[in-house]
Amino acid sequence: MAELHSDANNINKDTALDEKGNAPNDRTKPPNQHDILTGSRADGTAFIGGSGGGVPFPDMTCGNWTKGTAEGSAMVGHFDRSGPVTASWANSWNSSHPTIGCSMEKIRPTGGDGRLYCFAAD
C-alpha cells in the first residue's frame, strides 16, 4: 500500500486500463473520461467527516457510493496524470478534485464517466 500511494507507483495512461484492457479516453480525446472516482486523499485515507458529512470536509464519496443525484460530491483522480495546471494535486491519480454532483450528468462535465479503480494483488 505504501508504494501505491508514493511517487513510485506506476499508474498512468498506459497502465490504467478498463475491464476489457482498453485505455479510457484521456484529456486529449473527447469525451474526456480521465476522472476516476476514489473518494480519498492523496495518501489513500478517507477525508475527515466521512459519508455523514461534517467538518472539515463534506462527504467525498457520494454518500458512500449510494447517491446518484445532483447533490453530493466525490473526490476523483486523473488516471492519465494530467490536469489543467502543473500543480501536483492536478496530476494526482487518486485525489485531484471533487465532482460537482453524484449523478452522471454532474460527473461527466469535469471529465468523468463513473469509473472506479480495481487492483489485483500478485
Model segments located where?
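Secreted/extracellular ectodomain signature
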Residues: 1-122
